[in-house]
Amino acid sequence: MRKEERYKGVLNWFNEHVPVAETELHYDNPYQLLIAVILSAQCTDKRVNMITPALFRDFPTPEVMAASTSEVIFEHIRSVSYPNNKSKHLVGMAKMLMSDFDGVVPSDIDELQKLPGVGRKTANVIASVVYNKPAMAVDTHVFRVANRIGLTNNSKTPLETEKELVKHIPEEQIPIAHHWLILHGRYTCIARKPKCEECGLKPWCKYFLSPKKT
């Protein structure tokens, strides 16, 4: 199967069957989403959503968080993975938002990556979800699904995967395609024993069509 045919089939199926796809993190503004995405690194969205209501209540703006300390933030986020590092990142992020960006979460990916705790994946999430830019954030789900389906040619890194996906996915579909792949990887194309029989992508899936599934 030609790659163009595979992409067309996969994207058309998602567009028809999953017309609405969005992040499962709870937030009301760009600042809150930035916090949630930083916290979600190697942690489930469910766990993050359990702690962010109190965190958002007590630190409603970058200014308030910047005036706090990592020790105080730690007590709010201690149940997530790596709370010590993340508490330092959050305070540092808030301080830089105030000092360099007038308290406004930037839309530029390079600018976002200057913030403590913000790598390329997080920057792409913010650019895509908040500002609807054609940025493809590659997490473990996107990386796995893209390779398994055959959207990428055995990409070895998230950056390789990102570049190949944005090359083939129409620009206007990149923001929602990010969510399609994440949700598909989270609930259907899971890491171990993917639920192939209930998957609608079988006609185009390289893994399913392979005589030897690995």
Per-region residue spans from a language model:
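Catalytic cores of DNA base-excision repair glycosylases
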Residues: 2-213
